[in-house]
Amino acid sequence: MRFASLGSGSRGNALLVEAGATRLLLDCGFGPRETVAKLGRLGLAPEDLSGILVTHEHSDHIGGAFKLATRHRLAVWMTHGTFAAAPQGRSGIPRVELIDSQQSFQVGDLEIQPFPVPHDAREPVQFVFSDGRHRLGVVTDLGSSTPHVQRMLTGCDALVLECNHDEDMLQRGNYPPHLKRRIAGRFGHLDNAAAAALLSALDNCKLQHLIAAHLSQQNNTADLARKALAGVLGCAEAWVGVADQDEGFGWRALSLC
């Protein structure tokens, strides 16, 4: 199994997960033309995709999903709540699969386990992917951790973990008070310290890759996110990857130890 990012942040998110002949796009917050260009940088075209998974209905995650699916005849998986809250444009999608937020399902060579998260959307989920040998946990939009989130992510071989903001930078910044409250709230986004606390609650003995994701360009820095997560693992800060808003990150492969 391997994974890569097309970009991560408030202006758009998309993550690729591949196992065997199966390639899934997790979220698509970029327009179709930009998505095609970003896929090309990773050596892929839309025709190589097995489908699109959607975590929730916010535009930075779903904004380009329906157009890409319609143009390239791709299936889309999402929860009932996300489907109900999603913007218009679903009619041309060849196949929409509505998923239970806690029931695993199979797409080709990937087993996918969704799990609910605290976020200000209708029925948001994040996912753990498995190819039968390795597990990749992805959690990029949640305001707080829960025991269930911890159970889902513990023991993963790779993690893509939200480090949205530095609390001091957010409070000193120029966002209006209501937006600061939303971001820092229980149903908003994890700050660096909260992400580190979540990481510290997990069994990380098999961890091969750790990526800090969904960083705010105004209220965080890559160095601060790396420092927070590396402090938990006792590893070099450079070992922690960061998903860039524009470039994402290249392919990361999971290997048998």
Where on the chain are the PLM-derived regions?
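Active-site metal-binding motif and surrounding structural segment of the metallo-beta-lactamase
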Residues: P32-M78
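Conserved beta-strand hairpin/beta-sheet module of binuclear metal-dependent hydrolase folds
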Residues: M1-L42, V125-T140, A158
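Active-site neighborhood of phospho(di)ester-bond hydrolases with catalytic His/Asp-centered motifs
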Residues: L26-G29, S50-E57, W77-H80, G137-T140, ...
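Short, basic/aromatic-enriched C-terminal tail that caps enzymatic domains
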Residues: A238-C257
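Structured catalytic core of nucleotide-sugar glycosyltransferases
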Residues: A4-A14, H56-A65, A69, F83, ...
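Metallo-beta-lactamase
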Residues: M78-R133
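Cap/insert and terminal regions of metallo-dependent hydrolase folds
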Residues: P147-D244
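Active-site environment of divalent metal-dependent phosphoester hydrolases
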Residues: H58-I62, A84-A85, A121-R122, S144-P147, ...
